[in-house]
């Protein structure tokens, strides 16, 4: 039989106080990894990886101060963090041995991959092609972006924006070990900036490719660390699309991206995320979002790739009347693990969050993982937070592990969560067959419709069609 685990916790803690905290900027002096390791705990494997990351950037041109600040703080965190195991609660159901047992090689130089660039599908949107963490192609038409909008490398920022962007770089709460690996290994920083009151009509399209692949027999695993920062000033609006694709369907590589987002007062960001990595790869992504008062952040995600795929989403509401919406769909069609770990922190009155997560496991050795945390702190009165996860297990021994966690400290709230796990309904299949439709066609139609609820939430038709066709091709 298919296996399913649901671990739920609803906690009411009326006497605890939790006020929003601002993290202060800290400047550090760059020192070698080996020197820093003497004064802190270090897992030997992590230390070796940290040294490889440092060596990979040693030949690069001198970095900007904010990027160097990220590298220094990430090195400190990395050297005090052991490699995660199944004994660690955040990785209880997620096995990272695919990476741990490999010979990891950070990609240190930018290679112009003509095969990828020559075979790009056309898009109407302003876009960047990022290969192995390096920006390889940037396409911006003369009238594509309104005045004041910036899209490009940090090193190309105009002087009047440099100080503004630098206020936020390296000033996010720390993530886990993989976040620190990105911080040490990111070769550059991509920046998207939207000025006050500016509404960008068309989305900005970030297309990530893995051009360098390793060898499963020798266990050589190239790793890339793309990093993007987005700042939407007060009253601004924009959409961004992230698409991750492997050069080879069976490519053996590891993509380890980080996206950091600041949405200022009354600003809006629509975030579309399409993960189509190779079935032999590892993909571990962090998305950090900070929302100010009256702002809106919406994520729509479809993930199907990677032998190991994980998305860590951390959203913090830093003002009242704030809306967060996460709509995600994971589909396992091979021997793979797809994992969503989300955390939404509501700290102010009249905040709202809506979360829908769907997953399909269509392989007997496939596994889906969902760990969804929503924390409603004491000052977040009149909050409305809802969370729902639905899963389809289509093969014997297919597995899903669900852990909804709703923590409520405020006492004037409207909050709910639910989970449902099943196979396809027999009466639905019978309905199709009674109308002359064969069983296999009926199953494919029902499976496709299960994910379409999420796919239809993509705000742009081009992305909807691409996601729909991709999912159909996997069925």
Swiss-Prot record:
The keyword Chloroplast applies. It comes from the Eukaryota. One of its GO terms (cellular component) is chloroplast stroma. Pfam families: SUFBD_core (PF01458), SufBD_N (PF19295). GO terms for biological process: embryo development ending in seed dormancy; iron-sulfur cluster assembly; thylakoid membrane organization. Residues 1-36 form a transit peptide. The keyword Chloroplast applies. InterPro entries: Fe-S_cluster_assembly_SufBD, SUF_FeS_clus_asmbl_SufBD_core, SUF_FeS_clus_asmbl_SufBD_sf, SUF_FeS_clus_asmbl_SufD, SufBD_N. SUPFAM superfamilies: Stabilizer of iron transporter SufD (SSF101960). It is found in: Plastid, Chloroplast. Keywords: Chloroplast, Plastid, Transit peptide. Its main location: plastid. Interacts with NAP7. PANTHER family: PROTEIN ABCI7, CHLOROPLASTIC. This is Protein ABCI7, chloroplastic. It comes from Arabidopsis thaliana. The gene is ABCI7.
């Amino acid at each position: 039989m298919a296996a399913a685990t649901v671990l739920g916790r609803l906690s009411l803690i009326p006497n605890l106080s939790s006020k929003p905290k601002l993290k202060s900027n800290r400047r550090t002096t760059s020192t070698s990894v080996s020197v820093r390791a003497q004064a802190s705990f270090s897992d030997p494997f992590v230390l070796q990886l940290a040294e490889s990351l440092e060596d990979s950037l040693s030949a690069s041109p001198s970095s900007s101060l904010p990027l160097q600040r990220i590298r220094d703080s990430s090195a400190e965190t990395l050297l005090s963090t052991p490699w995660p195991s199944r004994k660690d609660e955040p990785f209880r159901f997620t096995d990272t041995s695919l990476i741990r047992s490999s010979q990891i090689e950070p990609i240190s130089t930018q290679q112009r991959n003509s095969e990828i660039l020559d075979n790009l599908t056309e898009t109407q949107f302003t876009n960047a092609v990022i290969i192995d963490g390096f920006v390889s192609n940037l396409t911006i038409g003369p009238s594509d972006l309104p005045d004041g909008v910036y899209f490009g490398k940090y090193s190309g920022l105009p002087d009047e924006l440099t100080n503004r962007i630098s206020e936020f770089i390296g000033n996010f709460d720390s993530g886990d070990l993989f976040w620190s690996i990105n911080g040490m290994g990111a070769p550059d920083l991509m920046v998207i900036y939207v000025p006050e009151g500016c509404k960008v009509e068309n989305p900005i399209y970030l297309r990530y490719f893995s051009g360098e692949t390793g060898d499963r027999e020798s266990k050589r695993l190239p790793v890339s660390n793309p990093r993007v920062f987005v700042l939407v000033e007060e009253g601004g609006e924009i959409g961004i699309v992230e698409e991750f694709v492997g050069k080879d369907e069976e490519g053996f590589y590891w993509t380890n991206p980080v996206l950091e987002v600041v949405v200022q007062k009354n600003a809006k960001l629509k975030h579309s995320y399409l993960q189509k990595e190779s079935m032999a790869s590892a993909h571990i992504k962090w998305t950090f979002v900070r929302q100010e008062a009256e702002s809106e952040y919406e994520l729509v995600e479809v993930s199907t790739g990677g032998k190991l795929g994980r998305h860590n989403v951390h959203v913090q509401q830093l003002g009242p009347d704030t809306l967060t919406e996460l709509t995600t769909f994971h589909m396992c069609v091979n021997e793979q693990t797809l994992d969503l770990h989300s955390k939404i922190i509501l700290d102010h009155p009249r905040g709202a969050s809506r979360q829908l997560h769907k997953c399909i496991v269509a392989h007997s050795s496939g596994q889906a993982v969902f760990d969804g945390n929503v924390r409603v702190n004491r000052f977040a009165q009149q909050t409305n937070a809802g969370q729902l996860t639905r899963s389809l297990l289509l093969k014997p021994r297919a597995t899903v592990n669900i852990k909804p966690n709703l923590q409520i400290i405020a006492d004037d709230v409207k909050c709910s969560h639910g989970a449902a796990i099943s196979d396809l309904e027999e009466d639905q299949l019978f309905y199709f067959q009674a109308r002359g439709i064969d069983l296999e066609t009926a199953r494919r139609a029902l499976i496709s419709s299960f994910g379409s609820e999420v796919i239809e939430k993509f705000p742009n038709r081009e992305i909807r069609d691409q996601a729909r066709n991709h999912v159909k091709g996997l069925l």
